[in-house]
Amino acid sequence: MTYKIGVIGDKESVLPFKLFGFTVCFADEGSEAKAALRKLASEEYGVIYITEACAATIKEEIERFNGQSLPAVVLIPNHDGTLGIGLSA
């Protein structure tokens, strides 16, 4: 089975990932990030990258995926730099 890769975050940070063929979801609010995460998780995504700024608004939603092999939810810094929460996750 082939899995896809998705990225969730603000437009400036995640738009470049389209160059690699990743699915990109723009989210500036927690509700948008939560909806995008649920949508990608319900489809055939093996890895979902989320900017730390978005992840900070939906911590409890992300925690649902802890201990699951798929999808792997990975926090990444945005274009402003790291908040440090990706390292502690």
Q: What are these model-derived regions, one by one?
A:
Residues 38, 53, 63-64:
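Extended, charged amphipathic alpha-helical "stalk" segments
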Residues 2-34:
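N-terminal first-folded block
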Residues 29, 51-53, 77:
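Short secondary-structure boundary segments
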Residues 35-42:
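Acidic, metal-coordinating helix/loop segments flanking the phosphotransfer/catalytic sites
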Residues 62-89:
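C-terminal structural segments of small proteins and small subunits
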Residues 55-57:
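Glycine-rich nucleotide phosphate-binding loop and flanking beta-alpha elements
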Residues 46-50:
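Periplasmic-binding protein-like
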